[in-house]
Amino acid sequence: NLYQFKNMIQCANRGSRHWLAYADYGCYCGWGGSGTPVDELDRCCKTHDDCYTEAGK
């Protein structure tokens, strides 16, 4: 959910940018996702997305 996304981003970037700046970041941060993550933060978003996919099964 959005609250978890906010907490994940704040933890990952140590407050260097506002969490909403990542709502459409890379390939996986924000709605949906596909392709190869562009960096560690994007990989973190992919892991989060994958977890939600598995939980929904």
UniProtKB/Swiss-Prot annotation:
Binds 1 Ca(2+) ion. Ca(2+) binds at Y28, G30, G32, D49. CDD domains: PLA2c. SUPFAM superfamilies: Phospholipase A2, PLA2. Its EC number is 3.1.1.4. Its cofactor is Ca(2+). One of its GO terms (biological process) is lipid catabolic process. GO terms for cellular component: extracellular region. Expressed by the venom gland. It is an enzyme of class 3 (hydrolase). Snake venom phospholipase A2 (PLA2) that inhibits collagen-induced platelet aggregation. In terms of inhibition of platelet aggregation, superbin b is more potent as superbin c, and d. PLA2 catalyzes the calcium-dependent hydrolysis of the 2-acyl groups in 3-sn-phosphoglycerides. This is Phospholipase A2 superbin b. It comes from Austrelaps superbus. The lineage of its organism: Eukaryota, Metazoa, Chordata, Craniata, Vertebrata.
